[in-house]
């Protein structure tokens, strides 16, 4: 990655989950390629999250972007984080996704103008999520199937994501039937492209606002690359009290209109379009 001619940033969304966020930040301390900036998009967390972020400030290039808690406003805080960011290339992820040591390096490796990257995650049950400590992240033991099985992880085909073989990962990226969509927990693209589509649609709440952002990138002519087996993060378990049938139905209708109309700029994004 010595020849990289662009800066890279990581945007991490968070809300009142300092214990999970701490594990994630341990992961970013341990990257083979260090990000030039980390922007925390904080949807109104309490003071314990601020204190945690400040404790990492001397070790990581962190910016804390916060607004008052007014319910689930992830799209709005992501737009504020976009404005606060300065890196050419941005990786978007969440407070519950611990990155493997080569996570940033992998996104940089596959970055290409005219494309965004679609990563995935390996979901952990709550008991193992709670067990993971700093040494497990630093040593990369937490990404070892042998260690995870010893902690009680059930074997499944999804475990192939953690095999760590680059050739196999590339093969699986090519044959997976999963579409290369914009996934809020693990996706990356050029900052200028995010501004060209006016960021995230602030009319949307939980459920699909990331996909709709990606669908407008497609409308713009941006293509996607599948890296779900190469850019690995561990997804820590959590509840979703903000998930409602009404918001999901509303968001599906917005996404359907985005695909049908071919719009690129959301009217309710970084700038408000009349």
Functional labels for PLM-detected ranges:
Residues 6-9, 37, 212:
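Cell-envelope/extracellular polymer assembly enzymes that use nucleotide-activated donors
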Residues 26-35:
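Short, acidic, metal-binding catalytic loop of nucleotide-sugar glycosyltransferases
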Residues 35-44, 65-67:
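Short beta-strand/loop segment that forms part of the nucleotide-sugar
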Residues 42-51, 97:
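A conserved acidic beta->alpha catalytic loop
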Residues 68-85, 102:
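Glycine-rich, basic loop-to-helix element that forms the pyrophosphate-binding segment
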Residues 90:
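Short aromatic/hydrophobic "clamp" motif used to bind/position activated sugar donors
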Residues 102-151:
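Conserved donor NDP-sugar-binding/catalytic core segment of glycosyltransferases
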Residues 185, 206-213:
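Acidic donor-binding loop at a coil-to-helix junction in glycosyltransferase catalytic cores
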């Amino acid at each position: 990655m010595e020849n990289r001619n662009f800066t890279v940033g990581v945007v991490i969304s968070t809300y009142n989950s300092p214990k999970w966020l701490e594990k994630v930040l341990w992961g970013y301390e341990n990257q083979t390629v260090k990000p030039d900036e980390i922007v925390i998009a904080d949807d109104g967390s309490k003071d314990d999250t601020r204190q945690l972020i400040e404790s990492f400030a001397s070790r990581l290039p962190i910016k804390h972007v916060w607004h008052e808690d007014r319910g689930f406003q992830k799209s709005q805080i992501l737009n504020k984080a976009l404005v606060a960011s300065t890196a050419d290339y941005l990786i978007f992820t969440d407070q519950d996704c611990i990155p493997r040591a080569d996570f940033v390096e992998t996104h940089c490796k596959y970055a290409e103008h005219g494309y965004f990257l679609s990563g995935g995650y390996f979901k952990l049950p709550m008991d193992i999520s709670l067990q993971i400590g700093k040494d497990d992240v630093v040593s990369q033991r937490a990404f070892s199937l042998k260690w995870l099985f010893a902690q009680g992880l059930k074997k499944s085909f999804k475990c192939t994501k953690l095999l760590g073989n680059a050739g196999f990962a590339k093969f699986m990226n090519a044959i997976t039937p999963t579409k290369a969509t914009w996934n809020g927990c693990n996706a990356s693209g050029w900052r200028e492209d995010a501004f060209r589509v006016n960021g995230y649609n602030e009319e949307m709440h939980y459920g699909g606002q990331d996909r709709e952002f990606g669908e407008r990138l497609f409308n713009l002519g941006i293509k996607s690359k599948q890296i779900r087996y190469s850019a690995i993060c561990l997804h820590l378990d959590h509840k979703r009290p903000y998930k409602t049938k009404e918001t999901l139905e509303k968001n599906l209708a917005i996404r359907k209109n985005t695909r049908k109309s071919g719009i690129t700029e959301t009217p309710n994004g970084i700038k408000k379009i009349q």
